[in-house]
Amino acid sequence: MNKPVLVSFLVSGDPNPDATLKFMKTLDKYSGVIELGIPFSDPVADGPTIQAADVRALSNGFKIAKSFEVLKEFRKESDTPVILMTYYNPVFKRGIENFVISAKEAGAKGLIIVDLPLQEATEYREICKKHEMGTVFLAAPNTPEERLKISDEASTEFLYLISTFGITGARDTFEQMTFDFIKRARTTCKGKICVGFGISKGSHAESLIEQGADGVIVGSAFVDIIKNYGDSEEALVKLEEFAKELSEGIDKGYEKRNK
């Protein structure tokens, strides 16, 4: 991840596993990383869009093993890094080590466990290190300096900067607070920093990259397309068009940053 990248988020199994695989292949063209969300019945950090996608996947009989199968299939054609996003409950129920091994065997590059605080993640981090599984932790605009440093050190792939307070979901604009947070993280952190929550336009990606982000994480806006177009050729066209717009925004932001 040298040049800034698009991190594209999809909910695994929405609306079905075969569609997820097609969506991943479509987004792969413009994505430096793909984040694959494992549906969960109580996704507290996610807004209505991703919650609804989780419900769609779960109501169609989704099982965690399906995420691993989809990833294995994707791996046959692409070496783009895939980060699995989940909540702690499914990992705990399966057993942390079993989950990490399954994810590794499927071809995952790293894991995000949204609701696992860093101070409670010692065992998880040790297991990930043992199996060479990457870790991604989150930081918010009010994260103190020292915790930001520790979170950065604990994140082997990138640190996930939450652009604003609250839940995921598309927004129209970003506040100065977000840009200040990126600059602060850029100064404090040694590793990569990617910004997520609320990115829904190429211009958003442009401004966030210009401020110093190494990547933008886009989820709800992609999931909205899937909600509207389902498992269809039109969905693939719309996903690709939007990914292209975001990618172009990233490139523009990077050019501005380097002027």
Swiss-Prot record:
Q: What is this protein called?
A: Tryptophan synthase alpha chain
Do you know which Pfam families this protein is assigned to? Trp_syntA
Question: Family assignment?
Answer: Belongs to the TrpA family.
Keyword terms of this UniProt record: Amino-acid biosynthesis, Aromatic amino acid biosynthesis, Lyase, Tryptophan biosynthesis
Listed under GO cellular component are:
cytosol
**Known role:** The alpha subunit is responsible for the aldol cleavage of indoleglycerol phosphate to indole and glyceraldehyde 3-phosphate.
Q: Where is the active site?
A: E35, D46
EC class of this enzyme?
A: lyase
Report the pathway entry: Amino-acid biosynthesis; L-tryptophan biosynthesis; L-tryptophan from chorismate: step 5/5
Q: Name one GO molecular function term.
A: tryptophan synthase activity
Q: Which reaction does it catalyse?
A: (1S,2R)-1-C-(indol-3-yl)glycerol 3-phosphate + L-serine = D-glyceraldehyde 3-phosphate + L-tryptophan + H2O
